[in-house]
Amino acid sequence: MRVRDLARTWLTHLAVERGLSSNTLSSYRRDIERYCDWLEAARIGDISEIATATVEAYVMDLRRGVDGRAPLSASSAGRALIVVRGLHKFALAEGLVGVDVAADVSPPSTGRHLPDTLSVPEVETLIDAIPTSDIATPVDIRDRALLEVLYGTGARISEAVGLMVDDVTHTPEVLRITGKGSKQRMVPYGSMARAAVDDYLVRARPALSKGRTPVLFLNQRGGPLSRQSAWAALKKAAGRAGIAKDISPHTLRHSFATHLLEGGADVRVVQELLGHSSVTTTQIYTHVTAENLRQVWRSAHPRA
């Protein structure tokens, strides 16, 4: 079977049978199209023509950068390999090949990258940089509510902008967050986030709304707030607050997890709140808190 035809069938399977989100599917499509392009350049068109050495050569080229493409980091090449593995696993399951040639291909080695976080005072400065007084604009009020939700729940930006008004509940006081694979989780949100969301619903959202859209966070035209606009709001707040750290879309999520663990929360509870399918993913934050402890020890202990 032609690899491109197989790729289209597989992506349809992921959308229909697995229920992957449109964002995840778009990412998979980009990775698999890059793989197909590379195979065609190597004059390989049929899935049966691919060997383990072929996949290994592809990963090496991802790291080097070929055909005018920039080299990928080890982590990015590793994610691309995961997609390729998924395609070959599907080919085996469908009986199109007799062996999964990608199963034993190792991802590029990468050093452990500890996620960047903000301290508690930095988070407070970040959020307080957005006006809340009577002169605050509807966008200011919306942005403050958005940041409070991101830090108060650990939601991904894509999850936060995907919230519906009906996802906000007061009895109990939780947000219904829809994560990867359309999996839902109920996450408590604290008094500061609740107050900011309530203020937004009363003072700002009616001014932004141009119709009856059920989406919680709206843009200035009354439509759903995009991930890019939410990210811009976070960067704008960081600029107002004078925070020099390199803020990423996941910074508040990382900070949420780190501060919970530093406060004594069990790692499996944090796993549930973040919506991680495996506790291994969450344990990266235990390394962050351990590193913080080592830094304090080095600066304070007389024999450090």
Swiss-Prot record:
GO function term, MF aspect, one: DNA binding
One biological process term in Gene Ontology: chromosome segregation
Annotated active site: R156, K180, H250, R253, H276, Y285 (o-(3'-phospho-dna)-tyrosine intermediate)
InterPro entries: CB (IPR044068), DNA_brk_join_enz (IPR011010), Integrase-like_cat_sf (IPR013762), Integrase_catalytic (IPR002104), Integrase_recombinase_N (IPR010998), Integrase_SAM-like_N (IPR004107), Recomb_XerD (IPR011932), Tyrosine_recombinase_XerC/XerD (IPR023009)
Location of the Tyr recombinase domain: 113-298
CDD domains, sorted: INT_XerDC_C
PANTHER family per UniProt: PHAGE INTEGRASE-RELATED, TYROSINE RECOMBINASE XERC
Self-association and partners: Forms a cyclic heterotetrameric complex composed of two molecules of XerC and two molecules of XerD.
Annotated function: Site-specific tyrosine recombinase, which acts by catalyzing the cutting and rejoining of the recombining DNA molecules. The XerC-XerD complex is essential to convert dimers of the bacterial chromosome into monomers to permit their segregation at cell division. It also contributes to the segregational stability of plasmids.
Family according to the record: Belongs to the 'phage' integrase family. XerD subfamily.
Protein name per the record: Tyrosine recombinase XerD
Gene: xerD
